[in-house]
Amino acid sequence: LGKFEAGPHFLEVGDTFKITTDDILGTKDLVSTTFKGLPKDVQPGDFLLIDDGKVRVEVTEASDTVVTTRVVVAGNVSDNKGINLPGVAVNVPALSEKDEDDLRWALRIGADLIALSFVRDAQDVQRVHFIMDEEGRRVPVIAKIEKPQAVDHLEEIIDAFDAIMVARGDLGVELPLEAVPIVQKKAVEFARRMAKPVIVATQMLESMIDNPVPTRAETSDVANAVLDGADAVMLSGETSVGKYPVQVVETMARIVDSTEEHGLDRIAPLNVTPRTQGGAITMAAVEVANFVRAKYLCIFTESGDSARRMSRLRSSIPML
């Protein structure tokens, strides 16, 4: 969704809500979208899910520029919330015009990382690299795993991109909820095997948007992501719109620190045959270090590849 003149707005069941491709400032009844192909990709009877499925609307009419819907599940809508079309074959490029403009701007101001949304296959990174080459600057590109097509092409995506993010919010809209934990574990396992960083994101401490302490289930969720072997856990709404942004960061850091201190030995060993010389050397180095009870592991690296391959082994010996 685009921006609203005011808001957020609460949509009641039965309300008419229109989405237009025209560039306007939205009201409770009509708002713009950056996805210009939306009217062509939907038809009456299709369902649109807004803000990770918190609001559900049914398409009643689609013209050249406006999609008219009826609210089925009530909720708030506000600036820049995502729209999902589960089961609809969306004809949209990996990068919209705005995405390309934003990418160029990010490169010019010195962004360290770029995350690409709604990746479907390994080819989606090509346009990003083309623009980076035009701008004369390449930085790592993270593939956000949030579409069923991405799950189907997971290994080739991990191979093509520099890192992946398991974006569980959109995944839980596009896939059955019960499938998300398995996809998360599968993605983390594949990324570790291929020595690519993997981030677990979305709704990790969601209740802290409004509360100063998390639920016990959320605490376990963060810890389990660490125990799965994830390289990073990420906050989103908790810090962008939440009431307790500092407390939520401190809370997540405490959970991660405690899990790493007491649970590193619970992370499943990486039972793979190394594919590269760097992989073989780092695996051998960890075995030797454990055998001689070394105090530290020193890693000499220029590209960072050896450090990543050493990190994925999750040794309890500190690394320099």
Where are these regions (language model features)?
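Non-catalytic helical/linker scaffolds that mediate oligomerization, partner binding
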Residues: 1-320
